[in-house]
Amino acid sequence: MTLAAYFLHDSVPIEALVRSIRLREGLSELFDCWVEVVCEDPDLDLASMIWSTAAVQLGDPGFPATDPEHWRYVHGAIEEARYVAPLGDWHRYSFRLRPSVHGLAYRVRTRIFQQKTVIDVIRQVLEDAGIDMDSIVFDCDPGPERDYVTQWKESELHFMERWLQELGIHYWFEHTEVDHTMHISDKAGTHDPIEGAPELEVHSRDDSAGGVSDQGSIHHVSYTTHFGHDRWASRDWQFKTPNEPRQAEEGEGGQELYEYPGFYETDEMGGGSRPSVCRRSSRVRPSWPGASTAVGCCRDAGSRWSGSIPTRW
């Protein structure tokens, strides 16, 4: 299958050619896209391009660019831009695209939020950082209101991801030619399926065809697993009720993970985090790393694989 790729930015000539793309993305992972472009202009204003947005268009040139089954976009903010080297009469440039929320990694603060749910806290963090809230979609239970939530000498990105992980909330990104949207959800069925066939053919490592077809396929798949815990228990102490310690537990089995202090004020707060903590510390953690030739496979997390499948071009 032949693929075509284009780099879309006002400062890059339209006749510029995409030489290579390296993209990594996944559930609850900030996408990271490296693009190398060649063009005849030796003097692109790279400094002015930093923090501006760009898009990579990738797909099958045999179909219209408006066909979502055969074309996809990766849209993001340019965090790095550099001149690489001359290439004959052309010039090589490299650009790195990241989501707009990745800028929170450079904002380290200490503050206390009072009488707010965790989702309210995350909304405030995003709004204070100047993130366009139209590019953030929340589809999750806000949870109980907390007396206080503390951010202590912590980047706003780590602070936000820490609380999302604590509550079992995941996120992913949806891309178009002009923007990208961050979806934050605690529901397993909120993803759209991949475009085209709902299932992809899997080829073994020994397949001489390499698993390449016009419909796309998955190849070089391996299975890995890690041992964790099958039971979680936690306790905490509150000075207001010293004779009534807080406690919560989940799961059954002998491989217990015990946490003290649990950092929750009521049994209900501890209980609300039980399912996510138990899944996070699950005794068996399977994954199926592999490679794919399907353009739509890495569009979102809606494929039928129950593990993580890194897709590389």
What does each model-found stretch correspond to?
Residues 1-313:
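Amphipathic alpha-helical and helix-coil boundary elements used as assembly
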